[in-house]
């Protein structure tokens, strides 16, 4: 793997002539190699994690906002039941949209930063082990909390590193594989 995950220093070159001079099979292989190279690069992984995190965060935020059946944040009314139904719906949907957007931005940012950091560390170390995720978790957690002070950065570093280590240990364990036959039980 080359520096920071760019495969072969850039996009693959067509085997002969232009793209349109290739056979359909060659075009398919060229396109597949281009897509795979992009998805395996650090920028590609970071963008994919950010977009996926954004989508997952939006769904999570929408779900959490729908579960908050009390008064929305910042509402000056004592109870929602005092308002007409149409006004209640308007306030609830506005609040759900704000929470979903906020959660989506946070999840997307954290996913993109963590994934990009982990990929860069893996490329620099030229190893694929648990310590890449631990270091990336520490850098991501500490970096996100650095504005709150050194203690918050240290707690963020430790928290993200521990969570990343726990997920990596679980994902690398052999316990998750189902038995191949009933006799293996």
UniProtKB/Swiss-Prot annotation:
Span of the signal peptide: none
Localisation: Mitochondrion inner membrane
BP-aspect Gene Ontology terms: protein insertion into mitochondrial inner membrane
Membrane topology: Multi-pass membrane protein
Domain of life from the UniProt record: Eukaryota
Keywords tagged on the record: Disulfide bond, Membrane, Mitochondrion, Mitochondrion inner membrane, Protein transport, Translocation, Transmembrane, Transmembrane helix, Transport
GO cellular component: TIM22 mitochondrial import inner membrane insertion complex
Disulphide connectivity of cysteines: 42-119, 138-157
Membrane-spanning segments: 47-67, 130-150, 151-171
Example of a GO MF term: protein transmembrane transporter activity
Function: Essential core component of the TIM22 complex, a complex that mediates the import and insertion of multi-pass transmembrane proteins into the mitochondrial inner membrane. In the TIM22 complex, it constitutes the voltage-activated and signal-gated channel. Forms a twin-pore translocase that uses the membrane potential as external driving force in 2 voltage-dependent steps.
Family according to the record: Belongs to the Tim17/Tim22/Tim23 family.
Subunit structure: Component of the TIM22 complex, whose core is composed of TIM22 and TIM54, associated with the 70 kDa heterohexamer composed of TIM9 and TIM10 (or TIM8 and TIM13).
Listed name of the protein: Mitochondrial import inner membrane translocase subunit TIM22
Organism of provenance: Yarrowia lipolytica (strain CLIB 122 / E 150)
Lineage: Eukaryota, Fungi, Dikarya, Ascomycota, Saccharomycotina
